């Protein structure tokens, strides 16, 4: 199955998307995303490069700095970025760059992250007055070769940063754990205190190159097209699915800045919300602006951001604030534009809102929006309740349920590798494949795939389900994380190590394939075990540790689960693999050639856990599995049973075919 359509931000073409009957846009950018991180080093700033004189001729104009994505490291989700804004794409209405000099100026590297992975560029991102975010630039992910967004929150002084640092870190650490297909991803954050008079919090978010929903609605209105009700329903369902996920977190996360400018639509109809401004960031992290300038800014933003009546007066934001904002977004999506009653004013008042609601043709559409815009916060429904509104609720078809079972079932994600899954699709996704045989009146009738209407779009449908275009709203959605009361700093260790080890996050990904080998070091006769895991998000994880003859497979597996290296449900099959490896390797004195591990390139390495009696070395990568295991005498490989049956059937079919040919 093709992986060219990923629900992630990256560089790509800035062509204008157009609406098709299915509610999708036809823009097809190259998309990649990553969830790998690197160990931090002290922050540093790259000096600006000297620009060439204008009088010197350029040998060849440079193309616009749109970097085509490399390999896909995380196709499903990764920890989210819903957080604090700045994930928006460059304004698609702006004119293209006219010369190579302009391209070089915007591609100039201004700064790098402490870990050296992200490079801040001069090119700014149109972030549309996201409150609390002072500076937004495009940046390059040097490990994945894709564009990301560099966001900065500036403090008035060092004292203000220190007073809010603990709360800020707690908020951002929680946001790092978010994982939802309709939420823009959040990659990393750190603090910069090198300049005491200008301390900053910097965070990296996913770059959405396809543009915002606001831009899409403007182009749709310019082309004199009405948004189909089915597209409106699909977009509302995806937005509410993301809000329900945020509000179900413990503690709940309030978006605080939901508008059509902070909602992004991709080429396949996938909708993502970004520019999250949690209450801790909005009220505590941002600079202490002058009251007059703050009020002026609120008046200016009133023309673009539709906030609940209680916004600003409440001491603490609630989920009802996001529901009101969603109602305004739903109204704008249905009407394509909310025009002020007075041509001389850009403010949106109650009269304008009611006139726009009355212009809608669907009674159910008006009812849903009016419930969201209830002036009383306690009278507004929750995001989960809105998913069961008569206009949005539907009994899912067997086709959709089957696709979700095929794509998201833990058993299928574990038992089928991507190669085996693609092989099955190629084998059974053919027009002449017999889907059913019915006996009627003593006669047999066969139904083939070609007889089913729309079967030619089945592969695309399964792919859209995988990327979150068709969520299941009648069942419990993805369970959000329960945040810890305190999280460790991502960029610096505590100066005094606690006697109690920090809690370790559990692994949520499942294992698709795994290999294990043991070898004896020639200089010390130490037994080294290496485990290579293929996760369901296409990432590889390599684990290495020293073992002895007293170690058992059960003890080793329990330790892997306790440290959060593997999923609890994968414990049994890992234990079987380790037991077979120890029997073949340790008990036979480690016979066999030594595994060299050549060809493996890691993208992140975690420090060994010193407080444990055994030190595990772990590295994550997105390369192929087989390159690090070169010794068949000491390596064991786990092959799912269904994949074994499929391979056996393929071999038998090949034998039958060769026998028929020879005859």
From Swiss-Prot:
GO terms for biological process: endoplasmic reticulum to Golgi vesicle-mediated transport. The modification Phosphoserine is found at residues 489, 495, 498. Keywords: Cytoplasm, Phosphoprotein. Pfam families: PK_Tyr_Ser-Thr. One of its GO terms (molecular function) is protein homodimerization activity. PANTHER family: SERINE/THREONINE-PROTEIN KINASE WNK WITH NO LYSINE -RELATED. Disulfide bonds: none annotated. Residues 101-111 have a biased composition (Acidic residues). Residues 1-112, 481-505, 638-663 are annotated as: Disordered. The gene is Madm. It is found in: Cytoplasm, Cell cortex. CDD domains: PK_NRBP1_like. Belongs to the protein kinase superfamily. Ser/Thr protein kinase family. Residues 1-14, 47-57, 81-94, 641-652 have a biased composition (Low complexity). This is Nuclear receptor-binding protein homolog. InterPro entries: Kinase-like_dom_sf (IPR011009), Prot_kinase_dom (IPR000719), Ser-Thr/Tyr_kinase_cat_dom (IPR001245), WNK_Ser-Thr_kinase (IPR050588).
